[in-house]
From Swiss-Prot:
Organism superkingdom: Bacteria
Disulfide links within the chain: none
Protein's name in the database: Trans-aconitate 2-methyltransferase
GO molecular function, one term: trans-aconitate 2-methyltransferase activity
Gene3D superfamilies per record: S-adenosyl-L-methionine-dependent methyltransferases, Vaccinia Virus protein VP39
Alphabetized PANTHER family for the sequence: TRANS-ACONITATE 2-METHYLTRANSFERASE, TRANS-ACONITATE 2-METHYLTRANSFERASE-RELATED
Natural source organism: Acidovorax ebreus (strain TPSY)
Record's keyword terms, sorted: Cytoplasm, Methyltransferase, S-adenosyl-L-methionine, Transferase
Length: 258
C-alpha cells in the first residue's frame, strides 16, 4: 500500500481516539516503567499514554514514515521509531504493550499474540483494540465492488491485506495460559455522521486504502463513485438527516503472570 495520509486520518481523530481512551481505562498496571505504543500512528494514543504515565519510558513504533512525522510534531519529546510489528522485538521487556487499531493489519494472530505476551516483563500488560468490521456493509461493499469486472484484475488481492479476526474464544484460549488476567469485550459504536461522503472519507484513510491504492486515477474515481452510492443505500438517513455508521471493535487486556 501507499503510505498513510495523516491529514485525512485526523479528520475523525476524536472518534478514532475514543476507543484508545476506553482501552487505556481498563489497563490496571499501577506504574509501568517501559511502555511501547505498537502501531502508534499519528501519536494520538501515545499522547494518552504520556498523560497517564508521565514518568514512564515511552516509545512509539509504526511502519508509516508519514504518520511518524506527524507523531514527532505532536510529541517532540517522545522517541518514535519506524518498525514492522510482524518482526518487531523489544530491547527491554515492556511493562505495557499498547496496540490500538494496529494488529488487524498483521497476519498470523495465533503466533503474534503469543509472541507479544512473551515479550512482556512479568506482570506486564498487553492492551489491544482492533476493528471487527469486515462483516459490516462498509467492508462487504468494498469486496463486492472489487470482484466486478471493472476492477477485478487490479484488486484481486486487496481483501488479503486484512485477515478476519479470530473468535473471542480463540483469543482467550491463546492468552489465558500465559496470563493471570484476561479482559475481553466488544463495543459496537454508532458514529453519527453528517453525510454519506463523511463515511467514505473516514474509510478512505483506513479500510479503503488496499482497494484504492492499486487503481489508476480514472479507475479510482469510478470505484469511489460506485462505492459512495452503495454506502448511501446501506446507511440510510435518520430522522434528523444524519446517518449512523456502525463500527464494532474488539478489546483485549491481558496481564502476563508474574
Amino acid at each position: 500500500m501507499h503510505d498513510w495520509d495523516p491529514a485525512l486520518y485526523q479528520r475523525f481523530e476524536s472518534e478514532r481516539t475514543r476507543p484508545a481512551v476506553e482501552l487505556l481505562a481498563r489497563v490496571s498496571h499501577p506504574a509501568p516503567r517501559h511502555i511501547v505504543d505498537l502501531g502508534c500512528g499519528n501519536g494520538n494514543s501515545t499522547q494518552l499514554l504520556l498523560e497517564r504515565f508521565p514518568q514512564s519510558q515511552l516509545i512509539g513504533l509504526d511502519n508509516s514514515e508519514a504518520m511518524l512525522a506527524s507523531a514527532r510534531k505532536r510529541l517532540p519529546g517522545v522517541p518514535f521509531v519506524q518498525a514492522d510489528i510482524a518482526d518487531w522485538a523489544p530491547t527491554v521487556a515492556p511493562d505495557l504493550i499498547f496496540a490500538n487499531a494496529s494488529l488487524q493489519w498483521v497476519a498470523g494472530h495465533a503466533g503474534l499474540f503469543a509472541r507479544l505476551m512473551r515479550c512482556l516483563a512479568p506482570g506486564g500488560v498487553l492492551a489491544v483494540q482492533m476493528p471487527d468490521n469486515l462483516d459490516q456493509p462498509s467492508h462487504q461493499l468494498m469486496r463486492e465492488l472489487a470482484s466486478q469486472s471493472a476492477w477485478r484484475d487490479q484488486l484481486a488481492h486487496a481483501a488479503d491485506q486484512r485477515a478476519a479476526l479470530l473468535s473471542v474464544e480463540a483469543y482467550y484460549d491463546l492468552l489465558a495460559p500465559m496470563a493471570c488476567r484476561v479482559d475481553i469485550w466488544h463495543t459496537a459504536y454508532r458514529h453519527v455522521m453528517p453525510s454519506v461522503q463523511a463515511i467514505v472519507e473516514w474509510l478512505e484513510s483506513t479500510g479503503l486504502k488496499p482497494f484504492l491504492d492499486p487503481l489508476s486515477a480514472v479507475l479510482r474515481d469510478a470505484y469511489l463513485q460506485a462505492y459512495t452510492q452503495r454506502i448511501g443505500e446501506a446507511y440510510t438517513k435518520r430522522a434528523d438527516g444524519h446517518r449512523l455508521f456502525a463500527f464494532p471493535r474488539l478489546f483485549i487486556v491481558a496481564q502476563r503472570a508474574p
